[in-house]
Amino acid sequence: MKRNNKSAIALIALSLLALSSGAAFAGHHWGNNDGMWQQGGSPLTTEQQATAQKIYDDYYTQTSALRQQLISKRYEYNALLTASSPDTAKINAVAKEMESLGQKLDEQRVKRDVAMAQAGIPRGAGVGYGGCGGYGGGYHRGGGHMGMGNW
């Protein structure tokens, strides 16, 4: 009985941690993985900088809920893996949900990249490539957004 109480308390603590800290990780200014900085291209004009900033701000606003959901699913996935008897079916279901969320974020990222190209902002000029490819510092994909002049 003591073990069940400890497991329940640990699960509640993990859930509270996931609910309270996820917003910080999904935040608009976390990290510099997908921020905007010059990478050897020609300098952007003031108009291009403003356009790029708006495109990035819109992208982060539009993907905020998706990024939060992905982080919550990662917490759930990790909790399922650390259970005393891991449920393979539940773990696989959560993994598929994470994959689906990742694909939705990829689609939004492509839309952002197309908007940047259509605005005449050269690839690599004023746009960071994301340290690990896209969604958030330690989460295998870039997600932090610091914006121009905010380093």
Curated annotation (Swiss-Prot):
Species whose genome carries this gene: Salmonella typhi
Key words, A-Z: Periplasm, Signal, Stress response, Zinc
Q: Does the keyword Metal-binding apply?
A: no
- Main location (coarse class): periplasm
Spell out the family assignment given in the record's similarity comment.
Belongs to the ZraP family.
Q: What does this protein do?
A: Part of the Zra signaling pathway, an envelope stress response (ESR) system composed of the periplasmic accessory protein ZraP, the histidine kinase ZraS and the transcriptional regulator ZraR. The ZraPSR system contributes to antibiotic resistance and is important for membrane integrity in the presence of membrane-targeting biocides. ZraP acts as a modulator which has both a regulatory and a chaperone function. The zinc-bound form of ZraP modulates the response of the ZraPSR system by inhibiting the expression of the zra genes, probably by interacting with ZraS.
What is the name listed in the Swiss-Prot or TrEMBL entry for this protein? Answer: Signaling pathway modulator ZraP
Q: Where in the cell is it found?
A: Periplasm
Signal peptide stretch: 1-26
User: GO cellular component terms?
Assistant: periplasmic space
